[in-house]
Amino acid sequence: MKKELLAPAGNMECLKAAVFNGADAVYMACKSFGARKFANNFDNNEIVEAIKFCHLYGVKAYVTMNTLIKNEEVNSFIEQAEFLYRNGVDAILIQDFGMICLLREKFPKLEIHASTQANTSSYETAKFYYDLGVKRVVFSREVSIDEIDSIDVPIEKEAFVHGALCISYSGECLMSSMLGGRSGNRGECAGCCRLPYTLLDGTTSISNEKYLLSTKELNTTKYIDRLINSSIYSLKIEGRMKSPLYVGFITKLYRRLLDEEKVDLDFETDKLKTIFNRKFTKGRLFFEDDASLMNQESPNHQGLVIGNSSIYKDKIKINLNRGRVLYQNDAIRFVNSGRGMMINFLYDKDMKLCSKADSVCYVDNKLNISSSDIVSKTQDYNLENEFKNIDSKKIEVSFSVVARIGHPLKVSISDGYNNIVEEIGCVNEAKNAPVDDQTIISKLSKLGDTPFTVSNIKIEKDENVFIQIKLLNDIRRILTEKLINMREKSNINFESCDLVFEKSESKCSSNDFITCLVYTDSQIRACLDMNVSRIYVCDKKLYDKYQNNSNIYYMLSLIHISEPTRQ
């Protein structure tokens, strides 16, 4: 089964990086309803251009609308989905299965994917979404590849193969709301899992590590053969808040692996470490154990270790490890101190300015560092330039020319899927020099800034024909413009049904219903005196004292943040 390589795009630059580096499909979000609210995302004008751009290059365009939807947002949600559908979106990713049901009823032919937050982790959940009319499910990142293969439901399977992991189950994080005041289920993740914590046994700290909830980055490049032979159809890269360099590099790497090119994986992984890594894990997808999922030392970009530093007069001396190179305009980080800098000036072993070093070198001590350290490279200037200058993707087209004296010039263009035929002007008998095949080929091949490149030109013509050069130029322009327009609108197939919302009687009680969370005996008594409807107790001993009261419930504490002050 041919796999789909699905890449992220937080903005137009990232989208182009994905398309030009081999993505089969791209996923992105509008300004509303996406689970990455703090990515740049696309306004309605931009999303239309993004969809057209993807379709022009034969790439599918998916849009995420995967937040949980409030009642007052339902109409806006449906309007946004309709706007996307009318403009040719290939699929919409949704978490809220209430919205799945509404869109399935309103737009029967709109392709819907259940996002990873929809918790597809078993046969039952996959079958549930299949029965709702969902075309594809994105499996939870807690599910192994063997489990995915064992789920025998006629539904497309998608799984994350690279990028950041969420410590909460399938990205459904309540911690962000509770601690950061921003709901991950509403696209506003506060990144609480990347903060430092102390693990306590009573009041005693029992861990030397700070970042107890911070996961490594998923990386399955070593397991590409197993992925190719799996039942997973779409291989998904995380990263809608990452840079165009990250998106382009990761997409190109997986493209090469899927196309079974010969890849020096160690060499490419070193590049990847420079671009972004929190250390790597094969994830639950490939049976990673708990400890190996986590990087509890640091939540940030680690870079690639390239050598060691020491202080020499007013400079920092760097002894580069074998095979490591440092360039002017690279960025480095001193691992133990956690401080970093750009290299504006690089000096060789003789203290002369240079642009590249591969053994001993010196940099200015801009940070006033006073001790030796391990050095990692966190930004590679040459690698960034390499991806900035990447050629745009070209689509192969063929032309067919028929030139008969006394008839219009007839030319067709084909991209292998679409065929357009145009006639223009009139072919005359040559009075002097007849047009030759090479002239026709030369004029039709001048595709300039179009996304096309010529693979073949077939010519049928009478002897001694004359064709105006202007006719060849005009018909080439007309054909390419029509083909661009046809490709851009390749998935516009809108169909809708009326959607009726039946009003139901309010289920809200006229009586106030008050719920309280308490920690102490005095708080419980105060709540009972005030006739609080429901009381949650965190302390098990305290709950045992009042367990016969039907209004009092014991609440398990998943994460112990701090001991509250007793009153």
Question: How should these model regions be labeled?
Answer:
Residues 119:
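Beta/alpha (TIM)-barrel catalytic core signal, keyed to glycine-rich beta->alpha loops juxtaposed to Asp/Glu
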Residues 42-47:
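Glycine-rich, highly charged phosphate/nucleotide-binding loops
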Residues 100-104:
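Short active-site loop/helix that positions an aromatic residue
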Residues 1-21, 25-32, 48-51, 57-85, ...:
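Surface-exposed amphipathic alpha-helical tracts and adjacent flexible/coil segments at the periphery
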Residues 34-37:
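A short acidic, helix-capping loop that chelates divalent metal ions and anchors anionic groups
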